[in-house]
Amino acid sequence: MISRIAVVSVTALVLSVALHADCLAQRGGRRGGGWGVGSAYNRMYDITTVETVRGEVARVEQFVPYQGALPGVHLVLTTGSESLSVHLGPAWFIENQDESIEVGDDVAVTGSRILFLGEPAIVAASVRLGEQVLQLRDWRGIPVWSGWQRW
């Protein structure tokens, strides 16, 4: 009798884990939540459009780059000539950094200039605040939160 209960319990546990993993995969879960190396969003990063912009942070907000992706963080940067959305990365990664970027900070952002929903934006590779640098992507645009590198 105990072995039958054990089999039923183990089966229920396995099914529960499998269903949970399937739900995570549909939302991006372990694959970066829509922010990973192979995601449609990440493929917008173009090393030929990398530039550095400087300005003052006007807003720091969460956003979802597309349906089904986990929330990310972007900031609105006011430069001398424009107001520009700067996409930093997934919220779970940005919010777990030692330092934070605040409204009013003067920053230098290096990243790929893209059109996002018809508006200019920068997908950030790094953000410099004083002497501190928040590294978000390598020179190829591969996110540091991916946990691995392609050679």
Provide a role label for each language-model segment.
Residues Y66-L88:
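OB-fold (S1/OB) nucleic-acid-binding surfaces
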Residues R54-V57, G104-S112:
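OB-fold and OB-like beta-barrel modules that bind single-stranded nucleic acids
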Residues F93-V109:
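Short nucleic-acid-contacting surface segments enriched for D/E, G, S/T with interspersed K/R
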Residues G29-T52:
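Short boundary/loop segments of OB/S1/cold-shock single-stranded nucleic-acid-binding domains
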Residues I114-P143:
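OB-fold/S1-family single-stranded nucleic acid-binding modules
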Residues T49-A69:
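Structural detector for short beta-strands of small beta-barrel domains
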Residues V8-A18:
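Bacterial N-terminal signal peptides
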